[in-house]
Amino acid sequence: MKYVVVILDGAAGWPLTELGGRTTLQSASTPHLDALAREGVVGLARTVPDGMEPSSSAACTSILGYSPVADYVGRGAIEAASLGIDLGPDEVALRLNTITLTDGVMSSYAAGHISTEESRAIISEIAAELDDDTFRLYPGVSYRHILVVTGHPELLDVGYTPPHDISGREAAPHLPTGAGAELLIDYMERARPLLERSAVNRSRAKSGSPLVTDVWTFWPGAAAGSLVPFAEKRGISSAVTSGVDLLNGLAVLFGMDRLDIPGVTGDSGNDYVAQANGAIAALSDHDLVIIHVESPDEEGHAGDMAAKIAAIEAIDRLIIPRVIIRADAGDVRVLAMPDHPTPILLKTHASESVPFLVWGPGIVGNGAEGFSEVEADSTGLVLDPGSRVMDLLLR
């Protein structure tokens, strides 16, 4: 048996008045997901335990069949693993975003979704001036980077606010707080004049693109402890395709292969067809392949209802049919689900359970008429903890 997992990041949400009380997932045209739901098992999965931040790291850890509590790794450390950074015992890795503040307000947590080329140039400029025995800055993809701090374990307990949680709000009240926070705030302040004279920003000003006015640190993580590799835990080989460092970092930590597919990105510019075709090709020498698509989450953070619907529809139109065609051989099971909701009204993650569907040989339908939060709730099936979805897929 072969297995395909499709993660529609942040695709779940809340009912919207503009959509007649329907969610973006309900309103999206998803005939292929709906067809799988009618023939498969549909329910809700509790991917984020009570009391835990509804992060993609926790939720995706659950989907992969691990416990986000017992197998917890801080987000910064996960993304550091994706970049090939080996953390020492006295090092803390943090996500560092390039952002845009306008009159002190978080106008873009992603500096207008700056290109990787431009962002890396800016990060190189900052690193050249600020890297020392305490700080090391590593470029990532687009606006997402990693800052490694040596000798300050207290940073693990600082209070942080992700910048995407405060879009359109004054940033100053949400700066890091607690013991050690002043170290990070000082770093962020020292980066500002470097950004003001950046050659990249001069070019962006001419083109009318949002300037990178600041950097913002959050999501700390220390070196991961002993994690059981996926192959040892499940007895099968696996691979991951994703346009973001989070999933690629989880792949590294859990011993999964990473698929390098040209055109796969973490935004609406993702080449869905290339991602689907590359993942399906990987089934020839892997038992399980995970297709992670970030675009619905990005549009949820932007509060763009139409764009989020379009992203969900693109997955259904360009990825799911190709998976179904491969499944016609009769030896493929499919799991499709969001990791968490990213409601348009909230513009950040929520902690509610998310819909899932499992379809394929040996799976008997349980009465769902389509794939949505409402249909999943109507079946009465709830998997808590959410890691049980992997058990259901592989049983």
Regions found by a protein language model. Give the residues of each.
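Feature captures the catalytic ectodomains and active-site-proximal regions of enzymes
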Residues: 1-395
